[in-house]
Swiss-Prot record:
The keyword Heme applies. This is Catalase-peroxidase. One of its GO terms (cellular component) is cytosol. Its EC number is 1.11.1.21. The active site is at H98. It comes from the Bacteria.
């Protein structure tokens, strides 16, 4: 064998495997618990220095200069990818829409907040065809501003300024989206293994949770109709389900569709079989670009993207009422695009309602509508809304501006996270507003006094700890919703969630409110404590007392400043999606699910931004603190409950215990003395996974060691403090 074919470092030949190749553990054991999602986006994959703070860099940005550069780019048509109608606005709007539009309310994942459209699988979804060109067109802008402007912000900003450059007044823009540097491993996009497959339905047409899109690789619905069948009324049902799961009501949905489709065109000339592979599958010389078409030049008027062909309006680069005007002015006839996709054409169209050819303004061509577009007229709910918008252009413009702002900011959390000079002043209900602090905050002396009152109140350690956990653990790192700030645990719908044990919660909250009122009334100055702060402080006091009982004195850091939201500031329907279907930290399962309890624990831990060690120490600590749902004994592996010991780990790892399932589903278990057969403990899958899974057992062994008690307490306190403050963005 030639020495030229041998690696000078490893000695391997060209045909040999390399590091990282071969069969992975998950190939051998596909049901293995997926813990890697807890350790994403570390400094090991991030090229930015540790001290880098995007908020500070964005603050140095001149948005007016960025806007000017983007305006220039919009009409600077490039030969390698010419602009339709001489304006890239439609392309950038689609890029922005598809970046933000992956958001779903079920778990808060997706959306445009991380710049994830740059990575697989999104960069290669069929619905994102040729958006690689949009991002490549933006590279000179990104290159110019570098670390001051993230890709995530730029992809949203480009769509906003595209709208403005074509005559539309947007609602505003908030920056602050921080880029990720690797694909997200936590987002479930579906079980399908082929593009555009739809094995996500059960029953008549029940879409699997938490998914929102109807097919693998689509952002929303199939524009040709459900399963490619051109039925506008049936399409309306799909649209309502999908947009609803993306946090949009019927009026917002119509505004988004009608407003967004006022601009740009679809591309569907030539044979789809002539389109090359997506970016992730393209050859190396394509340099990250995909979908190279062999039809003619493959660009301009010979572009192939969705397979649909044509513009929606006679003037696709200006804001007007053209979309709704065409929708209601004409009857529509089913036809097929040159690429063979179902679409609709207007009958007896007038000359003035023809659109210019995208790359030859001397030619006039018919407009089109998709099956999904016709749902805006034919659906019994969407139809009247569309008609009202058509008859009231100002109302339509305002609705689209607000819906577009919601689309592009829904995953960013509260308004306090928005950056820049274009943030609108108005508070919006979907931003989960909380009041500003309007009083002097308590200090160390008052904090110590309140802890004494809380511990002397008659409330138990489990009551104090479980209430604080219930309040804070609603937080989702995905869309930055939930958390203890606002004290919404006392409001609908949270006060009535089964997992929060409403009867017990009511008693605890009444006692906490008494303490709060008595304390505030006794203050001669302006100091006050909010119920939100007191709930968290009560949990901290309970943890500290439990640690003291175990022989370790600790003080949990406490920073006041939370405020109490009102019911009027709380959208009950919107908050309903935050209800835990399972909370392994409290050993709670609402019902039996197709996924295991331990998988749901890892999922919730990821939403809480916890690492595997943090998840492990929290479960072990909360078990001995006796905060299980319904005070269940499962996993309470201690004879000293309400004492913060490492007993959970010591007894879990005790080989003197033999475990047997109590149910045929293997979801509850009994541990008996291996010699005598005497019962010792009961447990759930969430408890036993820390002894069964090799990675979690390795962590459990750290905390189960004879000299681990102090480390266990301090690690528990650190993880507890993290959860209590997840929504305190102002502290970051």
């Amino acid at each position: 064998m030639s020495e030229h074919s041998r690696c000078p470092v490893t000695g391997r030949t060209a045909g040999n495997p390399v590091a990282g190749g071969g069969i992975a553990n998950r190939d051998w054991w596909p049901n293995q618990l997926h813990l890697d999602m807890l350790h994403q986006h570390s400094s090991l994959s991030n090229p930015m220095e540790e001290a880098f703070k995007y908020k500070e860099e964005f603050g140095k940005l001149d948005l007016k200069a960025v806007k000017k550069d983007l305006y220039t780019l919009m009409t600077d048509s490039q030969e390698w990818w010419p602009a339709d109608y001489g304006h890239y606005g439609g392309l950038f709007i689609r890029m922005t829409w598809h970046s933000a539009g992956t958001y779903r309310t079920g778990d808060g994942r997706g959306g445009g907040g991380t710049g994830n459209q740059r990575f697989a699988p999104l960069n290669s979804w069929p619905d994102n065809a040729n958006l690689d060109k949009a991002r490549r067109l933006l590279w000179p802008i990104k290159q110019k501003y570098g670390k001051k402007l993230s890709w995530a912000d730029l992809m949203i900003l480009a769509g906003n300024y595209a709208l403005e450059s074509m005559g539309f007044k947007t609602f505003g823009f908030g920056g602050g989206r921080v880029d990720i540097w690797e694909p997200e491993e936590d987002i479930y996009w579906g079980k399908e293994v082929e593009w555009l497959d739809n094995k996500r339905y059960s029953g008549e047409r029940d879409l699997e949770n938490p998914l929102a899109a109807v097919q693998m690789g689509l952002i929303y619905v199939n524009p040709e109709g459900p399963d490619g069948k051109p039925d506008p009324v049936a399409a309306g049902k799909d649209i309502r389900e999908t947009f609803g799961r993306m946090a949009m009501n019927d009026e917002e949905t119509v505004a988004l569709v009608a407003g967004g489709h006022t601009f740009g065109k679809c591309h569907g000339v030539g044979d789809p079989k002539l389109v090359g592979p997506e970016p992730e599958a393209a050859d190396i010389e394509e340099q990250g670009l995909g979908w190279k078409s062999g039809y003619g030049s493959g660009k301009g008027d010979e572009t192939m993207t969705s397979g649909l062909e044509g513009a929606w309006t006679p003037d696709p680069i200006h804001w007007d009422m053209g979309y709704l005007g065409m929708l209601f002015k004409y009857e529509w006839e089913l036809t097929k695009s040159p690429a063979g996709a179902w679409q609709w054409k207007p009958t007896d169209v007038a000359e003035e309602d023809l659109a210019p050819a995208a790359h030859d303004p001397s030619k006039r061509v018919p407009t089109m509508m998709t099956t999904a577009d016709l749902a805006m007229r034919m659906d019994p709910i969407y139809g009247p809304i569309s008609r009202r918008y058509y008859e009231h252009p100002d109302q339509f413009a305002d609705a689209f501006a607000r819906a577009w702002f919601k689309l592009t900011h829904r995953d960013m959390g509260p308004k306090s996270r928005y950056l820049g000079t274009e943030v609108p002043e108005e508070d919006l209900i979907w931003q989960d507003p909380v009041p500003a602090v309007d009083h002097e905050l308590i200090g160390d002396r008052e904090i110590a006094e309140l802890k004494k009152r809380l511990l002397a109140s008659g409330l138990s350690i489990p009551e104090l700890v479980s209430t604080a956990w219930a309040s804070a653990s609603t937080f989702r790192g995905s869309d930055k919703r939930g958390g203890a700030n606002g004290a919404r645990i006392r409001l609908a719908p949270q006060k009535d969630w089964e997992v929060n044990q409403p009867e017990q919660l009511k008693i605890v909250l009444q006692k906490l409110e008494e303490i709060r009122q008595e304390f505030n009334d006794a203050q001669s100055g302006g100091k006050r404590v909010s119920l939100a702060d007191l709930i968290v402080l009560g949990g901290c006091a309970g943890v500290e007392e439990a640690a003291r009982k175990a022989g370790t004195d600790v003080t949990i850091p406490f920073t006041p400043g939370r405020t109490d939201a009102s019911q009027e500031q709380t959208d009950t329907e919107s908050f309903a999606v935050l209800e835990p279907l399972a909370d392994g930290f409290r050993n709670y399962m609402k019902k039996k699910y197709s996924v295991s309890a331990e998988e749901m624990l890892v999922d919730r831990s990821q939403l809480l931004t916890l690492t595997a060690p943090e998840m492990t120490v929290l479960v072990g600590g909360l078990r001995v603190l006796n905060v299980n749902f319904g005070q269940s004994p499962h996993g309470v592996f201690t004879t000293l409950p309400e004492t913060l010991t490492n007993d959970f780990f010591v007894n879990l790892l005790d080989m003197g215990t033999e475990w047997k399932p109590l149910s045929k589903e293997h979801d509850t278990f009994e541990g008996r003395d291996r010699k005598t057969g005497e019962p010792r403990w009961t447990a759930t899958r969430v408890d036993l996974i820390f002894g069964s899974n090799s990675r979690l057992r390795a962590i459990a062994e750290v905390y189960g060691s004879d000299n681990a008690q102090e480390k266990f307490v301090h690690d528990f306190v650190a993880a507890w403090n993290k959860v209590m403050n997840l929504d305190r963005f102002e502290l970051g």
